[in-house]
Amino acid sequence: NHGGRATETARATIEALPEVVAEVGGRIPVFLDGGVRRGTDVFKALALGARAVGIGRPFLWGLGAFGQPGVERVLEILQGELKLTMGNCGTQTVADITRAYVATPDWKV
């Protein structure tokens, strides 16, 4: 979808993630890229089966505003938000994050 600029009516990556994870059936790791802005987004992606997430815009915002220290601060914020979310859900490690922690509507188009 490339930031919603080219096809703003396409499904969000997080909406397509469960379908992709089911389709590959564990044969390859699935990475989610697109729409990740907060630590809660990272948590949701991991809970829905992503092995990793790509984060672009928040780092670019930090870089544009404050240079390298801005990028480092964005990373600190995302880590803090993820840790807070994990704590609120009772998960101690990333491996503890499962689908049970998110409710998804019927995202079928």
Predicted regions and their residues:
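Glycine-rich, proline-tolerant flexible connector loops at the mouths of alpha/beta enzymes
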Residues: 1-11, 60-63
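Alpha/beta catalytic cores of nucleotide-metabolism and tRNA/nucleoside-modifying enzymes
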Residues: 15-32, 37-109
